[in-house]
Amino acid sequence: MKKIIILTFFLFNVPVLSQSGQIEYVSFLKSDVTSYFNKELDNIVGENDSKISYSLIVNGNKSIFFSENTLSEKTNKINLQEINSKLIGTIFLDLKNKVFVQKKIVYGEELTIKDTIRNYAWELINNETKIIDNMLCYKAIHKEIIEKKIENEKNEIQVIKKEKIITAWYCPAININLGPLGFYGLPGLIIILEDDIFVYQAKKIKLNLNFKQKKLVEPPKAEKYLNNDEFKLEYNRLKSARENMMKN
């Protein structure tokens, strides 16, 4: 029987991180997703077996996560890695002051979100472990409900709800409770993070930072900041504008 512990990471109980460092991740599509796109949508979707590098820089209770490179090859086909990189953008967390800032590209527009960091209810599955690059890692999952609005054949808007599962493999030996994409709250560094499409895996871990690296851990600057609700409104506006443009 699986031994599962529910760990809800409350903002008022954020522990002080005892280490700083820079972790380099690579992202790639899950094999079943790659096979589907290459087989079913070959005419519009390009090769998606490429990888994009990301950096997570941690300085105490502050961290920043961003892409190190983009795919340079120009093509008329869709590259999911490139799109995902733009949607992620730059993510800044300040756990002590409960601040989340994310700057990203949405439908060609640069938007910056600034709001309170969210809570994650992790399920720690302590009897599932694996060795990743000589590190003993434990499994944890986070579940959330995603709502998506679609238009049916009668031109009616329907709301579809779907459970999304995030799987993390974390290493308690590394005293950094962060990971890719702004995820945090596990008792150790997230070495691998998986959603339904992408995998993010740590490839290089360097503990302790020099002065230049510490200076990078600052929130993205913007002329205008949106909270989460304002961002959703702006996102829907840009989406509608793009859809109307495609119809004309």
Labelled PLM ranges:
Residues 20-248:
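Extended soluble regions of mature proteins
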